[in-house]
């Protein structure tokens, strides 16, 4: 009889332990989803504040929508950061679709920011030192630049010519565009991303690590 009650008590204890685990799981995931939604909305709003870096190619613009994505990387992980980036891109597609140009450019922007975030997280996420931040920023900038050269060559330039009536190869010259505009633009963009996030992360670090 004693062993029976002991077994029942143990089973009840295990049941409440399982309930506690599931409660914590749902509370944690609800909190996580709320942060991702908020960061995605902020990232979308930051898309409206963009500026050109190269006067001869004023259609190549940089914005700071990556900053909330990097905050998600700090608070959670790489997958959550990509989730913020994806939701931001969907909001852009649904609420501020600029036609063929946006339809062509948005996937490229997603890839560009995604590879930059991955490069930064590869060195910096597990061990957040200044050295690893610099290494991650350099890797992210290189990956960003290479990805944009390749995607412009095989994807964007042909599609802009076909659907947006803008043949970059004819007006500027393909290789001149790639190496005199795309490469320096993305190198500068990676540098701007790295410096901007470092500047906001320093004062916010004590807050972000507690979230």
From Swiss-Prot:
GO terms for biological process: riboflavin transport. Keywords: Cell membrane, Membrane, Transmembrane, Transmembrane helix, Transport. Gene3D superfamilies: 1.10.1760.20. InterPro entries: ECF_trnsprt_substrate-spec, RibU. Its main location: membrane. The chain crosses the membrane at residues 34-54, 66-86, 104-124, 134-154, 180-200. Belongs to the prokaryotic riboflavin transporter (P-RFT) (TC 2.A.87) family. Forms a stable energy-coupling factor (ECF) transporter complex composed of 2 membrane-embedded substrate-binding proteins (S component), 2 ATP-binding proteins (A component) and 2 transmembrane proteins (T component) upon coexpression of the 4 components in E.coli. Substrate-binding (S) component of an energy-coupling factor (ECF) ABC-transporter complex. Mediates riboflavin uptake, may also transport FMN and roseoflavin. Probably a riboflavin-binding protein that interacts with the energy-coupling factor (ECF) ABC-transporter complex. Unlike classic ABC transporters this ECF transporter provides the energy necessary to transport a number of different substrates. The substrates themselves are bound by transmembrane, not extracytoplasmic soluble proteins. Expression of the complex plus RibU in E.coli allows riboflavin uptake. This is Riboflavin transporter RibU. It comes from Streptococcus thermophilus (strain ATCC BAA-250 / LMG 18311).
């Amino acid at each position: 009889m004693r062993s029976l009650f002991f077994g029942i008590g143990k089973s009840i204890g295990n049941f409440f332990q399982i309930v506690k685990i599931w409660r914590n799981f749902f509370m944690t995931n609800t909190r996580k989803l709320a942060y991702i939604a908020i960061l995605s909305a902020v990232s979308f709003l930051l898309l409206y504040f963009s500026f050109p870096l190269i006067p001869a190619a004023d259609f190549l613009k940089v914005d700071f929508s990556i900053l909330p994505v990097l905050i998600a990387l700090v608070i959670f992980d790489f997958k959550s950061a990509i989730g913020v980036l994806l939701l931001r891109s969907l909001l852009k597609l649904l609420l501020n679709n600029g036609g063929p140009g946006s339809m062509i450019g948005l996937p490229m922007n997603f890839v560009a920011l995604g590879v930059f975030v991955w490069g930064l997280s590869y060195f910096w996420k597990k061990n957040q030192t200044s050295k690893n931040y610099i290494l991650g920023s350099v890797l992210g900038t290189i990956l960003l630049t290479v990805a944009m050269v390749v995607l412009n060559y095989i994807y964007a330039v042909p599609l802009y010519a076909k659907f947006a009536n803008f043949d970059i190869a004819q007006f500027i010259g393909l290789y001149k565009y790639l190496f005199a505009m795309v490469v320096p633009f993305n190198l500068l963009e990676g540098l701007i991303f790295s410096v901007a996030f470092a500047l906001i992360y320093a004062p916010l670090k004590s807050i972000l690590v507690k979230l």
